[in-house]
Regions:
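C-terminal and inter-domain tail/linker signature
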Residues: 17-170
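Sec-dependent N-terminal signal peptides
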Residues: 4-14
Length: 170
């Protein structure tokens, strides 16, 4: 009986702990959704209030590595200057896990698609992406963007114009 009681108590504690992390995941997911909505409305200054000063962020471009808050702010401003009608459509939001233990930690991640219009040419764009968000004290402290930034930018370059040389008769 004593062993059964211990098992029941341990099980109840495990459920209580996981429910707490699930509530944290739900809260953080809502914050990440709000952050993306601000990106859609091009409200960079309000987006910046979601970011911790100690932010570390996986940047999406080849060779960019890990950026800090200034690099992320510059990227946000660049996207908002270069693209109109930005809309993120999530396929699904998933709970994140502690990278060392594999235990849910309240972080959130999402797979989805960004659509927008490139300002310079009016070209419509659709970009599949993955984003992760870790929070500390209600602010985004760590995470990243994973998508084909180079491919996206290459798709926006106009196709070369073929020049046909003709002979002139004099």
């Amino acid at each position: 009986m004593k062993k059964l009681s211990i098992l029941l108590i341990a099980g109840a504690m495990a459920v209580a702990c996981s429910n707490g992390k699930h509530a944290e995941f739900e809260k953080n997911t809502e914050a990440a959704k709000a952050y993306f909505k601000l990106h859609e409305t091009e409200n960079a200054e309000e987006m910046f209030t979601y970011l911790s000063d100690d932010l570390t962020w996986h940047m999406p471009g080849y060779g960019m590595g890990i950026g800090g808050i200034e690099e992320v702010k510059a990227a946000i401003l660049g996207y908002q200057a270069g693209f109109d009608n930005m809309v993120f459509t999530a396929d699904y939001w998933l709970p994140g896990v502690d990278t060392e233990t594999g235990v849910p930690d309240g972080s959130t991640r999402v797979y989805g698609t960004w659509t927008s219009v490139y300002v310079e040419t009016g070209q419509e764009l659709s970009l599949t992406s993955y984003h992760s968000f870790e929070f500390k004290d209600g602010k985004i402290i760590n995470g990243g963007d994973w998508f084909d930034l180079g491919g996206m930018m290459n798709s926006l370059v106009p196709a070369p114009v073929e020049v046909i040389e003709t002979e002139t008769m004099e």
